[in-house]
């Protein structure tokens, strides 16, 4: 993808992409207050983005199915609605200057196996958001995508927007990545659509990796829960496998800059563009998670397990979850796509975002986010080595028994082709 040159420094997301107001001899006219809407505004990223914009003087609407767990500021309005509800979107988008489409479903855990829900929200919801943006004459749309539109299990080292294509849709092992890739493309294809009565819809997409930061509610608590249950006593994958992460503060910065870069004041530099966004560093997941193990009072994983075993286990867990879903909830410890994410290097450059958006990520430490997290949890003492080994042995025997039963009753194939690639 090619982009328009020159850009300027960071400003607040206030330029509305409209013709500048004419000055008069009388007292100056005050600029109209910017009005933005954030879908998925009840989630961690959506709420953080909305809060930042509200502090800068922007009128903010947060739209989500669930109310945020954090307190709303006076400058923020919350609308409880679903992105699949066209009438609700049409009412909410009235007078909006910019839409940040953050809402999605199926990122991790058992959610990744809810195919119908994932499809209807990630693809169907995005189609409706684009359609209502046009009908309501919203000039700017920023879509929060994911690095998974390009990563599907094959190594990527310092990939960029031009050299790394979309991963083939039919080769994704999870529906979340597939539907996010479709929504990513739909958003970019919508760029340049004419608006009723004049004007043009300008769109761009941001592709972040996993998010961390204070009060993050998905990745850190889930891993911490597994650690406390002694489910993470092994490690897998190449010790050299690396990935990116992004602090919520940096991702919010990128969204604000992207919205600004879709205005006439910035020459529409981001129009029709995609950007990888991360902290500018690559890490090995197990090394990066070391502060979490330490702060919780548990030993780091020390048993190396073949990735093929873990991948097969994940496949069995997925099958068991689907088979038992009508009876009980049995969320998988890991899914196949998560195993690939941990075991296979996939890192991306942020040079394009730096050059075109003026993106300049601040430095953060995962250990600081861990420190805030453990302050609200009870530190558990380390167990003795003998007791730990006994627990591990019992769990291993139980797992092997369940694996044998699952393979027998579910008729699961060995997944040779997929396993050999890991």
UniProtKB/Swiss-Prot annotation:
Biological process GO terms, please?
steroid biosynthetic process
- Keywords tagged on the record: NAD, Oxidoreductase
The residues annotated as the active site are 176 (proton acceptor)
The broad enzyme category this protein falls into is oxidoreductase
Q: Where is this region: Disordered?
A: 1-32
Spans through the membrane = none
Give the EC number: 1.1.1.-
**Care to name a GO molecular-function term for this sequence?**
oxidoreductase activity, acting on the CH-OH group of donors, NAD or NADP as acceptor
Note the Pfam families from the entry.
Answer: 3Beta_HSD
The entry marks the following residues as binding NAD(+), namely 180
- List the InterPro entries: 3Beta_OHSteriod_DH/Estase, Lipid_A_modif_metabolic_enz, NAD(P)-bd_dom_sf
Coiled-coil regions listed: none
Q: Which domain of life is it from?
A: Eukaryota
- Family label: Belongs to the 3-beta-HSD family.
PANTHER family reported for this sequence: BIFUNCTIONAL POLYMYXIN RESISTANCE PROTEIN ARNA (PTHR43245), SHORT CHAIN DEHYDROGENASE_REDUCTASE FAMILY 42E, MEMBER 2 (PTHR43245:SF51)
Protein name, per record = Putative short-chain dehydrogenase/reductase family 42E member 2
The upper taxonomy is: Eukaryota, Metazoa, Chordata, Craniata, Vertebrata
């Amino acid at each position: 993808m090619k982009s328009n040159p020159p850009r300027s420094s960071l400003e607040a997301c206030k330029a509305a992409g409209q013709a500048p107001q004419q000055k008069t001899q009388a007292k100056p006219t005050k600029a109209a207050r910017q009005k933005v809407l954030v879908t998925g505004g009840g989630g961690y990223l959506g709420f953080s983005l909305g809060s930042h914009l509200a502090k800068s003087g922007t009128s903010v609407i947060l739209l989500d199915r669930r109310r945020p767990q954090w307190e709303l500021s006076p400058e923020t309005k919350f609308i409880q609605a679903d992105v699949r509800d066209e009438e609700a979107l049409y009412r909410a988008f009235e007078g909006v200057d910019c839409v940040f489409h953050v809402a999605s479903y199926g990122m991790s855990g058992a959610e990744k196996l809810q195919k119908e829900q994932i499809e209807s929200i990630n693809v169907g919801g995005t189609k409706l958001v684009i359609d209502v943006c046009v009908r309501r004459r919203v000039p700017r749309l920023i879509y929060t995508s994911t690095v998974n539109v390009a990563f599907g299990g094959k190594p990527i080292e310092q990939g960029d927007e031009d050299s790394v294509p979309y991963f083939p849709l039919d080769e994704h092992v999870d529906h979340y990545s597939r539907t996010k890739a479709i929504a990513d493309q739909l958003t970019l294809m919508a760029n340049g659509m004419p608006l009723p009565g004049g004007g043009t819809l300008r769109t761009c997409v941001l592709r972040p990796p996993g998010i961390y930061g204070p009060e993050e509610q998905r990745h850190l608590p889930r891993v911490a829960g597994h650690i406390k249950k002694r489910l993470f006593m092994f490690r897998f994958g190449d010790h050299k496998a690396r990935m990116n992460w992004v602090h919520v503060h940096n991702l919010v910065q990128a969204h604000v800059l992207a919205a600004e870069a879709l205005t006439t004041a910035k020459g529409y530099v981001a129009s029709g563009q995609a950007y990888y966004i991360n902290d500018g560093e690559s890490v090995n997941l197990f090394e990066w998670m070391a502060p979490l193990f330490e702060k919780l009072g548990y030993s780091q994983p020390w048993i190396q397990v073949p990735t093929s075993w873990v991948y097969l286990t994940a496949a069995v867990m997925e099958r068991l979850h689907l088979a038992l879903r009508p009876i009980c909830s049995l969320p998988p410890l890991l899914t196949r796509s998560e195993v690939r994410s941990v075991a296979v290097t996939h890192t991306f450059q942020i040079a394009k975002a730096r050059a075109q958006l003026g993106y300049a990520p601040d430095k953060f430490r995962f250990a600081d986010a861990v420190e805030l997290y453990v302050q609200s949890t009870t530190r558990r003492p380390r167990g003795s080595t003998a007791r730990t080994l006994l627990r591990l042995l019992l769990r291993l025997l139980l797992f092997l028994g369940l694996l044998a039963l699952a393979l027998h009753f579910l008729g699961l194939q060995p997944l040779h082709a997929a396993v050999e690639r890991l």
